[in-house]
Structures are given as structure tokens and as C-alpha cells.
Amino acid sequence: MTIKNNILVIGSGSREHAITWKLLESNQVDKVILVPGNASSSTMERVITVECSKIDAESISNICKEHNVEYVFVGPEVPLVDGIVDGLKRKGISCFGPTKKAAQLEGSKVFCKDFMARNNIPSARYQTFTDYNKAKQYIESLNYKIVLKASGCAAGKGVLIPNNKEEELEGLKRIMVDKEFGSAGDEIVIEEFLDGEECSLMCFSDGYSLVVMPPAQDHKRIFDGDKGANTGGMGAYAPAPFIVDCNNNATTDKSKSKSSFGTIIDRCVETILKPTINGMRKEGKPFVGVLFAGLMVSSSSSTTNDKVINVLEFNCRMGDPETQVVLPLLETDLFEIVLACIEGRLDGLDVKWSNKFAVTVVAASKGYPDSYPKGLKINGLLENKNTNDNIIFQAGTTVNGSNDIVTNGGRVLSCTSVSESLEDAIKNSYKLIETISFEGMQYRKDIGQKALNHLERKKQQQANSKQSVSYSESGVDIERGDAVVDNIGPLAKATTRLGCVSDLGGFGALFDTKAAGFRDPILVSGTDGVGTKLKIAQELGIHDSIGIDLVAMCVNDVVVQGAEPLFFLDYFATGRIHVDVATQVVSGIARGCKESGCALIGGETAEMPGMYKDGEYDLAGFSVGAVERDQMLPSNIQEGNILLGLASSGVHSNGYSLVRYLIETKSGGLTYNSIAPFDSSKTLGQVLLTPTKLYVLSCLAAIKSGGVNGLAHITGGGITENLPRVIPDGLDCEVELGSWEILPIFKYLVELGNMETEELLKTFNSGIGMILIVSPDKVDSITKSLESNNEKVYKIGKIINSKTSKQSKSKVIYK
């Protein structure tokens, strides 16, 4: 007769629901006591939820006595780091989880990094600091990208990945000075940023031996495409095919792998997991429980043996949501594994895993990972009957006074499906999550997509290796390229002007300046791109206006020299030509050319599947203009000249790396499809994709009227850095703050980034896209000319003599 045991599980998330669900499959388990638990007990038999305001050894031991519990399984890290295992052992209760000393692997990132260094476990180079000023000096001395880690427990959110030196120093301040993560930031780890694919690798351990679990991949960011703020995890899948030697059916050749998961995992066991378990034991901290290794697998090579694997972090417990995809693949009795670890006999157990795939998608509350509402009724949950292949694990749930299951946390549910193929597991997970709903429910739509892409590439590589190769099979489709040329031919022809003497599609474009009316011309060229504004256009699928930006960035530079843009050439590079997308982009280029009076006379469309992903493209433009030799600008700029600012249409095409960072990490969960907080008639994406203003025709008319001594195109660097570029040495620019309208989008960005005015003025155009330096007696006539060409004109300042010397470089002085 099998002895039935009661086991207590500490925790209240989907991880603990999954652990409880798996333990109940054991014929050795009678009841599971879930503390403090969630509403999952209302949908499972033999589960008792016990509320507990303080999770410590004293409280848990009292619950164990009341419910005749001999074994405790600790889910989250905080009780482990606080030493609950030690306390329960002293009271005679067996516990699955590491002691306080062993839990330092997660509780102190400083201890963890030093331990890895002592035991030759591969990890990024690093330094640790308790002194803010010394840490600041160290960061300022570095010339490579870094990661900032609060040393203590910070609920999985104490890691910052800055993009530049400014963000690095700001992140350091947030952790050590502002105490964003509390006492966890008293000590900090500064380590080198590693690039590649992240992987979660867990193992059971009895302190001597270990059993590795299927590797999983988590999705940390809140939004699709790994955008937005970090979360506890929005979904996961296992096994991860980029690190497991398997195809779409998850089958590996077990005769060639000790771990059953392929040679890469075998190497991880030998170089990471075993040295960790052995090292902890030798240092007097034997690790019993689940060791979680967060790995970075380099993408530097496509061959298995050349992959570089480093440890990002260790955790002292099972991951969430990784547990929800790993345990459904476990075929061995989980309770038996727990006993074997506690009793030091894990090496005598033959642990088996399914050859299937598991995928989980997390349903989260509106506003998560920031503030979110609670108490919202969850529809469809009770109608779902959990099976071995489709399971809804509960996290932030509770039962209200009406006996309804309602939301009670940020991450609410994990919808898990198991299938023979990864593709089917993904489809079934999304079918499952679509059967439930609550107000404001959000979830990612791309869980597992990177793995599917990997499998598709692998499949294609295998197919290509078996057959002869054509150019189209390499990913380059000449027919699609020809179709684009056919579509854009009429668009380009519509921009033809005097001087054009060649048609689109030749080896070179020809232009006759004499036919265009020039006597003694100087040619002026300008080249530019659109930058990361393209990322927003590609994400939203809005491609018909980005070409205007490309033209504007080039021709606005050309007109600064007093030149008339004559012709334009574009370069369009993409991973795969989509005829409709390319046509829309070029239509925008043609429109920009037409509005600037220049001809689109040539270009290049390049399909490069090895350089860009499908759906990605980049743009570059090249414009040539001409100005009569005796009419070049700048000319005759002197003290007393007036600065006339022309209003911008928006952000234009500079500063979008910062814009995207602010929207995706600081906006409280807003997306580019969200209604703009400052303009209810438009989405944020529509505001940000407003095309760069074309100033050519209005400025040429003003120049022709006389009195324009110079122009400055306000691009990256703002007024602060662009205006002095056209001013002679010995002169400064006095600019009056408040003399023009700062557009709402800039006020919003300033608010998100807590930016100073000085930073705004040297980063964005701030509402002024072009500045004309004008003779005082011509201000009125030039203003009228500009306004007649639909420009909004501001008198923003004047030219003054430098107060230092006649040789000093020009600068902007704000009043």
C-alpha cells in the first residue's frame, strides 16, 4: 500500500499552480496545501489554500502541524534568501529548496559573480561597487556597452540595459542614489553587455548530482517584438530549438547526448551546472532544490561546437513562466524527484521527459508592469477543463464575495499547450487564451515566433543543401525587383523638370544645368537617411510618407547653400522586396521631389536577405542642386542680423532612438497605436510619422527677394548645434526662449524623459525646422514672402558680437 503524503507549496503564482498540478499526479500525494495561494484551489480537488500574512518558518511550521505536512516545496526566491529552509529544518520539516547560504547565488549578484570567477564558470567581465562616485568614475572610463544589476533581490526587475553613456549614468543613479530597487541597490554589479539568444536552463539537484531540464526561452518585455518595459515574463516555450539539437518534433538523438537535449546542453552541464553544484558544496553551501541558469548563447557561429555560452545570472528556484512549460513535459513523478533531492539519492532516479513542445502565453492586467486594477471578473475560466495538453495556470487571481474568480495581480493567467510540434503548441496556446477574457487583458502575440523562424531557416538550409541553387533561392527575387521598377516608373516621370535628359533605369542619370537655366553654377550635394523613424513606420505598416522625410533631409540641406535642388536619387535596401511596400515608399519619395521642384532620376533597390530581416528596410538619399557662383550662401552675416524661425511639422527625422526609448519604456504601457495623450484625434504613431517639412520652395522665394544672408537646417543637435554651423567666427546667436511655439509632442517627450530645456534644445528641433539669417531692413518683406508660401514665421533672435574674441567659434546664447 502506497503511503500518501501531504506537501505544502509556498507561493501564489502560475509557477506554484503548475507545481501543485504536477504534484497531484503522484500516487504518493494526498493533498497539497497552497500558501498563500490563489483562486486555483477552487478549480482543483485535494488542494487547500491557506492565507498567511507573513511567510516565515514559524508561520509555515504551524500550518504544517495543522494539516499534517511533512514536506515543503518553496516556489519564490525571497523566502529562500531569507532562510526559511534553515528555519523549517530546525523544526524537523523536510524542505525542497536551498539554504540561506546556498540561496546567495540569487540573493547577492556580487556573491554570484565572485563565485563564478572563483570556479571558472563563463560569465561577462564585471566590477562591483558600494560607492556611487567610484562606480560613476568606472562607468565613465569604459568604452563598451554595459549592464547594471542591483545586487539584491528586486523581483526580477533590478537589471538595467542602457543604450549609451548618458543612460548608463542615469541608471546608476536610479539604482544607488534614488533607490528605485530599495536596499537591493546598496551594492551594484557593472558587467559587460553580451549579445545573442537568452536561454533558461534549470536542473534538479541533491547537492551532489543533478538532472537537467529541457531548456526554455522566456519573453521578458511587455510588448511584441521585445519592446516596452521588462516584466516577470510574458510567455515561454520549451525546448528551445536554437540550443537543442532537434527539429520541429522536438526529437533528439539521445544516443549521442548524455543530457538527452544535445551537445550544447551537454556542454552547459559540464562547464556550468556541474561546476556550480560542486563549487557550492566545496564552499560549505550544498545546493538542494532547483538551480536556474540564465544563459546567453552567442550567435557568432552557426556550428554547434563554436557557440559561446555565458551565464547571465543564477536563480535559486524554478523560473516563472519557464516552470509552466517545463513541468508539462516531465514524465517522471515530481514528488519522487523532490524526495530524491531531499534524501540525497537523485543519481538513482531515471528522470524522463516528453519529446513534445510546450508553450505558455501570459494574460496580464492592463497597465502591467506598472500600476493595474484588481477585482475584475475573469470570464471563461471555469468553462475550461484542464487536460494534460491544455492547461490554464492561475497567478494573480482570487475569489470575491460573489464567488467569482477575479484578477488580483499583474500577471493573471498562463495559458499552456503541449503538442507534437512547436507550431501547433503555439497555435493551441493562443486558441486557449482566446477563450478567456477580463477587462483590459493584454498578452503578447509573438510568443515562440523566434523559434519558428529558427526552425524555418534550418528547414530551408536542409532543403537547399539537397538541390541545385538559383539566385531566387538565395532570397533575391529579380522579378519582384522588376515589378517595383515598373510601378515607380510613372511616379518618377511625374517629377521630370527642365534639365532632365535621361529616363529611369539606365546605368547613369544625366542632367543638363544649362537647359535648367544656370549660367555659372556651383553644384551642391546633400545625402542623408531617415534613421530609426523607419522602425516605427515598419511596425505600424505606414510606408507612404517616410519617403518625404528622406527627400526633405537632403534637399533642406542643399537649400541652406542657396541652391535649387535639381535631381534626387534614392537607395532602398531590404531583406525581401514586398512590391506594395517598396512602391509606397518610392511614391513618398516622388511626392517629396515634386513638392521641392527636383526630379527623381535614379536609384537602387537592393534585396539582401542576409543583411536585413523580412519586413525590414533602410533608406538613403542623394540630392544635387545648383547655385550661381555669385549667389552662394551664407554671405555677409553680421551683427544685428535677425533670426527668423520657420515652424517644424513635428519631430522631423532626428532623435528617434531617444523617442522610441521614451515611448517604449517610460510611457506607462502606451504603444504607437495608442491615442496621443496630447491630441485625441491622432495616435502616437501618426504624430511621430508626420513627415519632415519641406522648406525648399518657400526659402528659394525668400532668397530670390533679397536680404537672406544665411540659413540653418535644424536637425540632430537642435538649434544649439546646427545654427552656429553657418555663423562666422567672432559672432554669436542670441535666441529668445519663448519666442516660438514648442509643439505638444516635444512637451510630452520632455515630461517622459524629465528633460531639461537645455537638453531639449540640443537634441530635437523643438518646433523650429529652419532658421533664416536676415538683414534687419528686409525682415518684413521676407516674412510676408514666407507666409505667402504657408510658412509659420517666428522672430526668435539676432546675431551679436562675441564677448570673447573675434576668433572664437560661434555659439548659441539663450535668453
Swiss-Prot record:
Chain sites annotated for binding ATP: 139-200
UniProt cofactor(s): Mg(2+); Mn(2+)
Binding site residues for Mg(2+): E313, N315
Keywords of the record: ATP-binding, Cytoplasm, Ligase, Magnesium, Manganese, Metal-binding, Multifunctional enzyme, Nucleotide-binding, Purine biosynthesis
GO cellular component: cytosol
UniProt keyword Repeat, yes or no: no
Pathway where it operates: Purine metabolism; IMP biosynthesis via de novo pathway; 5-amino-1-(5-phospho-D-ribosyl)imidazole from N(2)-formyl-N(1)-(5-phospho-D-ribosyl)glycinamide: step 2/2; Purine metabolism; IMP biosynthesis via de novo pathway; N(1)-(5-phospho-D-ribosyl)glycinamide from 5-phospho-alpha-D-ribose 1-diphosphate: step 2/2
The UniProt record lists the keyword Magnesium: yes
BP term (GO), one: adenine biosynthetic process
Gene3D superfamilies given in the database record: 3.40.50.20, ATP-grasp fold, A domain (3.30.1490.20), ATP-grasp fold, B domain (3.30.470.20), Phosphoribosylglycinamide synthetase, C-terminal domain (3.90.600.10), PurM-like C-terminal domain (3.90.650.10), PurM-like, N-terminal domain (3.30.1330.10)
Region (GARS): 6-452
EC class: ligase
InterPro entries reported for this sequence: ATP-grasp, ATP_grasp_subdomain_1, PreATP-grasp_dom_sf, PRibGlycinamid_synth_ATP-grasp, PRibGlycinamide_synth, PRibGlycinamide_synth_C-dom, PRibGlycinamide_synth_C_sf, PRibGlycinamide_synth_N
Reactions performed catalytically: 5-phospho-beta-D-ribosylamine + glycine + ATP = N(1)-(5-phospho-beta-D-ribosyl)glycinamide + ADP + phosphate + H(+); 2-formamido-N(1)-(5-O-phospho-beta-D-ribosyl)acetamidine + ATP = 5-amino-1-(5-phospho-beta-D-ribosyl)imidazole + ADP + phosphate + H(+)
Coiled-coil ranges per UniProt: none
Function summary: Catalyzes the second and fifth step in the 'de novo' purine biosynthesis pathway; contains phosphoribosylamine--glycine ligase (GARS) and phosphoribosylformylglycinamidine cyclo-ligase (AIRS) activities.
Matches recorded under NCBIfam families: purD (TIGR00877), purM (TIGR00878)
HAMAP family in the cross-refs: AIRS, GARS
Protein name: Bifunctional purine biosynthetic protein purD
Gene that this sequence comes from: purD
